[in-house]
Amino acid sequence: MSEGWNIAVLGATGAVGEALLETLAERQFPVGEIYALARNESAGEQLRFGGKTITVQDAAEFDWTQAQLAFFVAGKEATAAWVEEATNSGCLVIDSSGLFALEPDVPLVVPEVNPFVLTDYRNRNVIAVPDSLTSQLLAALKPLIDQGGLSRISVTSLISASAQGKKAVDALAGQSAKLLNGIPIDEEDFFGRQLAFNMLPLLPDSEGSVREERRIVDEVRKILQDEGLMISASVVQAPVFYGHAQMVNFEALRPLAAEEARDAFVQGEDIVLSEENEFPTQVGDASGTPHLSVGCVRNDYGMPEQVQFWSVADNVRFGGALMAVKIAEKLVQEYLY
């Protein structure tokens, strides 16, 4: 389709929405018309796309027949409100909210891992983007799985405040400023506890487990098509504004030397491998970048089948915007003509 695709971005004024517009332009995605959509209170705002200014429209007044592809990056409530109207109008929705992630007839896609499930995109005209933690984990693991197979995964994720939106980022900034000036913080704020210069575990819900940890396990099993996969996931709230970090223990089906694992990472898509005597950080290597950084690669002591590594990625640009755009690229290159 040489003239480009007409695209709507629901949640265009949010962090992921703005990063998605930037990513579409940077990767020269074939765009015909672009429609920036948000709630009524954001209508009329001006955004930049590809060197041009675009005006945000009220999603409630948008004619979905104008768009062929839509990126939904505004959360579950917005997805639930507009997905039926969009899909019934013939628009194909790439949804990042998690609302459809575990629906059996909706493809859940990490482009590097299971692009073949995109053949099912017409089941409901919806494709689900995994949580940014799942995308980060599987994008890093794909080269190792290809090299040595997969027996078991253990991952500890240190998540940034931006995972919970702008209010969380502002709350962390406010706490930090107060404490640096000797002012006590209000523990009734967004986090309910001091996060600045601190770490917070996540509490289990009524199901007896942590929602974010449960989502990683369920999504990884669905994407790898292995409901019995042994995977342990822990999530900790870190005092970082942007960028998630993961410490991963991967068990292969055969002995896999650390040097072999490093060679596999070098071949991985959108992976930057640190030198052996260096390591990546959220602040220095993740924030604002569209790639995954990996370091500290070594074998677990006395366990030649187990490889441990550290990864960092920008949850907004890599886990949010880039994953969605790469799904769209696969679609237009291989399935939509």
UniProtKB/Swiss-Prot annotation:
Any GO MF annotation of the entry: protein dimerization activity
What cellular component terms from Gene Ontology apply here?
A: cytosol
- Superkingdom of the source species: Bacteria
**An example Gene Ontology biological process:** amino acid biosynthetic process
Q: Which InterPro entries match?
A: NAD(P)-bd_dom_sf, Semialdehyde_DH_NAD-bd, Semialdhyde_DH_dimer_dom
Similarity section:
Belongs to the aspartate-semialdehyde dehydrogenase family.
Q: What is this protein called?
A: USG-1 protein
Provenance organism? Escherichia coli (strain K12)
